[in-house]
Amino acid sequence: MPLPPSAAPDPIARFRDALARAAAASPHDATAAALATADARGAPSVRMVLVKSADARGFAFFTNRESRKARDLAANPRAALCFHWPALEEQVRVEGAVTPLPDAEADAYFRSRPRESRVGAWASRQSAPLGDRAELEAAVREVEARFPGDEIPRPPFWGGYLVAPERIEFWRSGPGRLHHRTVYVRRGDGWEVGALQP
């Protein structure tokens, strides 16, 4: 299959264009992606995250660093992301190594979040067992009492991660399930691009 005309040399620019089209077509959580990780034994797990930026460095997301995904990444610092936009009949898959983002970037993003989300970040011990909902609600009240104003610092157990892409695949639905697939593979400072069978 020949390369489609949209096979631009820069996959990040192509992704950002697709994301803009997805946000225009269906603005609710266009940045949502399935994040797949695996623990030290290779046991996989997957969950949805919101990707907050995509640039030449990679794809950034933020989370509790005591969560299952964070434990997986500490043991096995590789991950895959999958964005699926039904309104466009397109998806993008990203694979690569994962590193923690600098604290300054995590601080800046944390400050931009709504107050209730910052409170929730302190109150939730993500992925830990929960006895009942009242336990979590009590933790929220404790955090609100501790930080009565709008200044809520970033918890030391909360931060960001960067997926540095080594492989990015763009998929677009085709008639008769003859879909269009273009893959970019990192080669040094550039990208090797090619088409895949559907």
Curated annotation (Swiss-Prot):
GO molecular function, one term: pyridoxamine phosphate oxidase activity
Organism for this UniProt entry: Anaeromyxobacter dehalogenans (strain 2CP-C)
One GO-annotated biological process of the protein: pyridoxine biosynthetic process
Protein name per Swiss-Prot or TrEMBL: Pyridoxine/pyridoxamine 5'-phosphate oxidase
Family recorded in the similarity comment: Belongs to the pyridoxamine 5'-phosphate oxidase family.
General function of this protein: Catalyzes the oxidation of either pyridoxine 5'-phosphate (PNP) or pyridoxamine 5'-phosphate (PMP) into pyridoxal 5'-phosphate (PLP).
SUPFAM superfamilies: FMN-binding split barrel
Root EC class: oxidoreductase
Lineage: Bacteria, Pseudomonadati, Myxococcota, Myxococcia, Myxococcales
Gene that encodes it: pdxH
